[in-house]
């Protein structure tokens, strides 16, 4: 047989699903990989049989019940996505909450969260700036990037952004599409307030004497938007 990578993956899924079927037939409760493999394989077979995407989305959520799996497994599987070849092309079947009907109960290892909203950077001053993307491509800025040094194609008050970062959750980012103009909230960088790398406009202590003025001059000389 000459098999593609995708075909080998499907055979691996089939093997795992067959193991899950045998264990289920013996009365064993399925773990996470077994449950995912079984549902995925059944959806793939449904695709092979010529069933429609809408039908398979419902079918995929009726294959297993909470009684078929170990405690906590339904809560681990929020969705399963299966790509398959239909008569009219390749499509993605997404099964949301594939193991439904789990009773509301505490699950081992889960987090019990208090209600309400978390305020980002509580008590820290917030500066709002209007930013325009004058570049011909999208620009994405991460949460802790020194905003003063972001892509030169973004136009805003650079001086006001010196020593600030985006007021968004750590690890997230804001994307600016070409020609887009939007407001962003900034908060002061914390910690030791030392910045290295980026666009090499600071490379040191943000608050050291003369650093801000030198960084602004460097931004102007390099043509950074809004530094003039």
Curated annotation (Swiss-Prot):
Region (Urease gamma): 1-101
Organism: Deinococcus radiodurans (strain ATCC 13939 / DSM 20539 / JCM 16871 / CCUG 27074 / LMG 4051 / NBRC 15346 / NCIMB 9279 / VKM B-1422 / R1)
Molecular function per GO: nickel cation binding; urease activity
Protein localization: Cytoplasm
GO annotation terms (biological process): urea catabolic process
Pathway assignment: Nitrogen metabolism; urea degradation; CO(2) and NH(3) from urea (urease route): step 1/1
Region feature (Urease beta): 102-228
Reactions catalysed according to its record: urea + 2 H2O + H(+) = hydrogencarbonate + 2 NH4(+)
Keywords: Cytoplasm, Hydrolase
Gene3D superfamilies according to UniProt: Urease, beta subunit, Urease, gamma-like subunit
Gene: ureAB
GO cellular component: urease complex
Name recorded for this polypeptide: Urease subunit gamma/beta
Family (UniProt): In the N-terminal section; belongs to the urease gamma subunit family.
UniProt-listed SUPFAM superfamilies: Urease, beta-subunit, Urease, gamma-subunit
Matching InterPro entries: Urease_beta-like (IPR002019), Urease_betasu_sf (IPR036461), Urease_gamma (IPR012010), Urease_gamma-beta_su (IPR008223), Urease_gamma/gamma-beta_su (IPR002026), Urease_gamma_sf (IPR036463), Urease_subunit (IPR050069)
């Amino acid at each position: 047989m000459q098999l593609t990578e995708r075909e080998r993956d499907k055979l691996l899924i089939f093997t795992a699903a067959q193991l899950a079927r045998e264990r289920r037939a013996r009365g064993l409760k399925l773990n996470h990989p077994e449950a995912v493999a079984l549902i995925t394989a059944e959806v793939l077979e449904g695709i092979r049989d010529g069933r429609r995407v809408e039908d398979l989305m419902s079918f995929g959520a009726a294959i297993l019940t909470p009684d078929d799996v170990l405690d906590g497994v339904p809560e681990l599987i929020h969705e399963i996505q299966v790509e398959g070849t239909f008569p009219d092309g390749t499509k993605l079947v997404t099964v949301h909450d594939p193991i439904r009907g789990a009773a509301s109960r505490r699950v081992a290892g889960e987090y019990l969260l208090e209600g309400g909203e978390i305020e980002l950077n509580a008590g820290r001053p917030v500066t709002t700036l209007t930013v325009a993307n004058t570049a011909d491509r999208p620009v994405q800025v991460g949460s802790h990037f020194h905003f003063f040094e972001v892509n030169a194609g973004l136009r805003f008050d650079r001086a006001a952004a010196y020593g600030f970062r985006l007021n968004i959750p750590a690890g997230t980012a804001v994307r600016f599409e070409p020609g887009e103009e939007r407001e962003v909230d900034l908060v002061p960088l914390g910690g030791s307030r030392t910045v290295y790398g980026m666009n090499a406009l600071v490379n040191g202590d943000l608050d050291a004497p003369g650093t801000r003025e030198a960084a602004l001059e460097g931004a102007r000389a390099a043509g950074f938007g809004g530094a003039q």
